[in-house]
Amino acid sequence: MKKPLNFAILKHVTTVNEACADDVIEALKGEYGTSKWLNKKSVLEALFTGQTNGFLKETRYEMVDGDLKIYFEAPPDGKEKINKYIPD
């Protein structure tokens, strides 16, 4: 059974050093590509919610061709919480 998309977004960030919304969309489009929620606005909302809840941390941001990219990581305590509450 497939995880809810918000869970998959958090789990993905635990598997990489850092990720922006575009990275997450690219990584999850194989499994969630038909979901209307796999878009930049919804993914950013999930990433910011993860940050607000203490699971993720913003690492950096940059402008690429007029597009703001905000990168997040799951620090060790965040990874631990995510992996505890969202099993593989």
Q: Across the structure, where does each feature detected by a protein language model lie?
A:
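A short, conserved structural fragment
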Residues: 51-62
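Short, Lys/Arg-rich nucleic-acid/phosphate-binding segment
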Residues: 60-70
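Short, amphipathic alpha-helical interaction segments positioned at domain boundaries
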Residues: 70-88
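Short alpha-helical segments that sit at the start of domains
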Residues: 1-18
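Short, positively charged loop/turn segments that connect secondary-structure elements
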Residues: 29-44
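Short acidic, hydrophobic short linear motifs in intrinsically disordered regions
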Residues: 19-29
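Short, hydrophobic-biased segments on the C-terminal half of alpha helices
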Residues: 44-51
